[in-house]
Regions:
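Nucleic-acid-interacting cores, centered on viral/eukaryotic replication and modification enzymes
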Residues: 1-200
Length: 200
């Protein structure tokens, strides 16, 4: 509701709140503890719900994403003096690959919304059928809009990647959608199991 500008404003508000929380964590006085808390509690997870809902729109409103990434950058620069662009990039990587897990909202926005839409597709498909049955929308309209938005986000992500990575995106999205469809069907049959998502 409220359009892209309203969502960008919500995101900036969340970034401002995160900055205030970083300022409070700073009082701890220990850079190791502060870094751990910043990654675990004040990272991109603070805005993940917004990125999953409208990451593509926020990606186009780069200033909104930068409002959050600037907070992360400021904390990292303060805790690791002399941090250059390459060090910040490494810090944004996951712990398993030698980073600090301080992911940037800009890097997560498109994958988050694409994953969310892939998982939501079976639910949207069912809702589309129910709305058509009730005479509220023409059959296929809601699903077509959902698929168009998903396709646009996939195209945006592919444009950000090198050719080798970009060729994998559609396959990964198709696999995620197929897995989501099977999981949704199992839930509808009362056989669903709610797995806990792994931490990155």
């Amino acid at each position: 509701m409220g359009g892209v500008q309203a969502r960008a404003a919500d995101f900036r508000t969340k970034a401002s709140i995160t900055q205030k929380m970083h300022d409070k964590v700073r009082r701890i006085g220990g850079s190791g503890a502060e870094l751990a808390l910043s990654e675990a509690c004040l990272g991109v997870a603070k805005v993940a719900h917004l990125l999953r809902a409208c990451g593509d729109e926020l990606f186009e409103e780069a200033a909104a994403l930068w409002s959050f990434d600037r907070v992360q950058k400021g904390t990292l620069d303060r805790l690791v003096p002399g941090c250059d662009a390459e060090a910040r990039l490494q810090a944004s990587l996951g712990l398993r690959v030698g980073g600090l897990g301080m992911r940037r909202a800009r890097d997560v926005a498109l994958p988050a919304v694409i994953a969310s839409r892939a998982v939501a597709r079976p639910k949207v498909q069912q809702l589309d059928a129910e709305l058509a049955k009730a005479g509220l929308l023409p059959a296929g309209r809601l699903l077509a809009e959902h698929d168009a938005a998903s396709g646009k986000a996939v195209g945006m992500l592919k444009a950000e990647l090198d050719e080798a990575e970009a060729t994998q995106v559609e396959r990964l999205v198709a696999e995620a959608a197929a897995t989501a469809a099977v999981a949704w069907l199992r839930r509808m049959e009362g056989k669903g199991d709610e797995a806990v998502a792994p931490r990155a």
